[in-house]
Amino acid sequence: MSKSNSKDTKVKAIAVFCGKIKGTVIFTQNKEGIVEIELNLSGLKKNHSHGFHIHEYGDMSDSCESMCAHFNPYGKSHGGPNDSQRHIGDLGNIETDGNGNAKYIFKDSSIKLTGTKCNIIGRGLVIHADTDDLGRGNDPTSKITGNAGKRIACAVIGYARP
């Protein structure tokens, strides 16, 4: 990553999914610290919502399982991306079209590509089989995982070429 003194410099990161589920997720942090998340994914279940989270580690030694829990540096309960009570890694759900593709952009003000506490570089990005209930379920697991189900695809988030 090249460094610049310009306040207009944007920091970019990428996660590349290979396998049955393919594509990229590009993260771009602007000078205000807001991160734009651009999805370009295929091979997902058609017309479905898949739980989508940043996990603690970018460790793929045991596929997606070694990425451990959701990234949660403040020790909060699971929630939705717009909730004040949420893991930093709680990005909500990926919405797919009739072909199983997800191609759109959304923003998040909690994750960061710089600094230390909320920095997601080197962490795991996981797509789950089921819909994330955003911590609103009636069982204890809802406040931990959102009942998003099995991990069906994962990638490591790394700095992107400028």
Predicted regions mapped to residue ranges:
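N-terminal leader/targeting pre-sequences
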Residues: 1-162
